[in-house]
């Protein structure tokens, strides 16, 4: 399924995703930023021909931004028009302005509504950026797949969405929420898997350069960097090198393109020098030894 969408998944990930679909349980994906957690939901939605609804989490995320809110300007306009026309029936005005016509559906409510009959893939991205109060609310939603709008009543999902939750583990998410889900830790890919990813995503990158790129990135991840390069950065670096018509790595090229691979100046300053050259020598020696 994922391979059809050009996503190379480890067997353990493919298995837990299959079980999540069959058991109709949310899938909780945890791992470092840049390992491809978000991409899983995108590829899954495309493979199943389902709409993708994404709730991007952030500090301070509230119900109005995540679930629903009322279109207050339109409601006020309707009230003014009613007053201008001489309408005095307050109950009728209230029923009108608190109807579906003025309801703005945010991602949670969108995920519970499938007008075309196809339950969407609901991506709750970077849940660890929110607070415990929002976690508690989300736990309630995932328990029954329903939301109560006081003015309209309870809105239930005719078919529960396929839920993918991701976190970068900047803080621990409450156990109660995790227990509702199937869990999988998404790690950086092994060298062979990352090489295959480059072959698929950057087909113009020649084999020698692809192997050097992967070996270099794999070695970088063993260092105590502020932020290790993810798979997305590996792809970006291979793409940049290809656009520069490079066929192999050399110290000058590595120095010129580090900004596509590393995103913090302290990391760049450390690698852009003797340590980076030593790393490149080790890569070339290692690849030469393995043929």
Q: Language-model segments: which ranges?
A:
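C-terminal regulatory/interaction module of P-loop NTP-utilizing enzymes
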Residues: 1-291
